[in-house]
Amino acid sequence: MKEYRVYLERARSRQQDFLYPLIFREYIYGLAYSHNFNRSIFVENGSYDNKYSLLNVKRLITRMSQQNHLIISANDSNKNPFLGYNKNFYSQIISEGFAIVVEIPFFLQLSSSLEEAEIIKSYKNVRSIHSIFPFLEDKFTYLNYVSDIRIPYPIHLEILVQILRYWVKDVPFFHLLRLFLYDFYNRNCFIPTKKSISTFSKSNPRLFLFLYNFYVCEYESIFLFLRNKSSHLRLKSFSVFFERIFFYAKREHLVEVFSKDFSYTLPFFKDPNIHYVRYQGKCILASKNVPFLMNKWKHYFIHLWQCFFDVWSQPRTININQLSEHSFQLLGYFSNVRLNRSVVRSQMLQNTFLIEIVSKKLDIIVPIIPLIRSLAKAKFCNVLGHPISKPVWADSSDFDIIERFLRICRNLSHYYNGSSKKKSLYRIKYILRLSCIKTLACKHKSTVRAFLKRSGSEELLEEFFTEEEEILSLIFPRDSFTLHRFHRNRIWYLDILFSNDLVNDE
């Protein structure tokens, strides 16, 4: 990475196109191969001894540059006519090369900003997706309203390329990227749809994740700009300028957005108690003030997506609810603010009176129904939550079968230890435990009772419930750690970088 840094600094100092030449460097594709989501796309059964060739990649790029992307052919084939090889195969290789090259300048920029902020040591904890929940526990108990927002897609591919061009000045590289994207959509759908986006994300995962995250980052940067500047804008001059290159200039070309709605309310628009969190395609906006301001932000989001990103967004994709009456779903948890009421008897001189105290607490619980649905989809139980055997694992040894189930239980327990109530988590463990026993009994062609009586595996299967407690007893001092505290308290692990496979936020 140091070599990339030196190369980029030299190229930028000469004001050259510094990304385009990297596309034709063979070591870039070797780097993509070593860091790829699925290495099998770089192996093709052919006459090249299962090795990719840079010459073939260049030939495919030449072919794409000679195509007319305004003409859609119904007979377009996935076969390259002059090579006879699978066109999708080479497209995936080029996609990985694009992803590696375009990630380099942003990775260097991120690393340098982290070094300047001196937060490298704590960066690993900040990266954890569960670091969101301590923030929610600290802030959301003082808030009243929450807005669930689902970020709309698909976005037109031309908008994606333009957004990237605002940040990196390399005309040949983005021209080639545009050719690649148009070539993909010409073979699937000229206008991006959810189906074509899903196809692109599966065949080109790394490039898709980068483009999608950059699209979200761009909309959030505009949102944060307006959030910070909204209270300083005057009544008659409030407007939104949807041009990233000259963000603070050309006031005569500012595009006024819902100025009618703001004509009498802008002086009260400042809201210091508004908080925003996001994970993947879902974000949450919470505020302490009246829902009127939340509706203003709702209309702002809709206009932003429609005017700047040309993405159609309907108002029903943004829901505003009271925190005390509504549970919002995030990262596989259901969260809501619970009101705890208590009565205190107070005495002043000879007068005695009762005082009602209302305290708020953020409840974060395990959603049992979606988890059972995920377990049923994975064939661990039926739709009612009754455990069933896993016949496809019956060919493995007893130790491997038990280890597989234990690994799933360990991961779920690790992920859901922040729950306020552990009862749902214990039910999931119980389902997996019985599914493991039934799988072993099915393998040995016996009943569950006969298998347990003959093999004495009951003590071994107790690890489903005791292993997590033993680990925590090693982390915390024994005088402070008790079984009662384990069942009652929430424990957030800050080493979780992605959601569990069984977590479903839909």
Swiss-Prot record:
<keyword id="KW-0694">RNA-binding</keyword>
<comment type="function">
    <text>Usually encoded in the trnK tRNA gene intron. Probably assists in splicing its own and other chloroplast group II introns.</text>
</comment>
<keyword id="KW-0819">tRNA processing</keyword>
<comment type="similarity">
    <text>Belongs to the intron maturase 2 family. MatK subfamily.</text>
</comment>
<dbReference type="GO" id="GO:0006397">
    <property type="term" value="P:mRNA processing"/>
</dbReference>
<keyword id="KW-0934">Plastid</keyword>
<dbReference type="InterPro" id="IPR024942">
    <property type="entry name" value="Maturase_MatK_N"/>
</dbReference>
<protein>
    <recommendedName>
        <fullName>Maturase K</fullName>
    </recommendedName>
</protein>
<keyword id="KW-0150">Chloroplast</keyword>
<dbReference type="GO" id="GO:0008380">
    <property type="term" value="P:RNA splicing"/>
</dbReference>
<keyword id="KW-0507">mRNA processing</keyword>
<dbReference type="GO" id="GO:0008033">
    <property type="term" value="P:tRNA processing"/>
</dbReference>
<dbReference type="InterPro" id="IPR002866">
    <property type="entry name" value="Maturase_MatK"/>
</dbReference>
<dbReference type="Pfam" id="PF01348">
    <property type="entry name" value="Intron_maturas2"/>
</dbReference>
<dbReference type="InterPro" id="IPR024937">
    <property type="entry name" value="Domain_X"/>
</dbReference>
<dbReference type="Pfam" id="PF01824">
    <property type="entry name" value="MatK_N"/>
</dbReference>
<dbReference type="GO" id="GO:0003723">
    <property type="term" value="F:RNA binding"/>
</dbReference>
<dbReference type="GO" id="GO:0009507">
    <property type="term" value="C:chloroplast"/>
</dbReference>
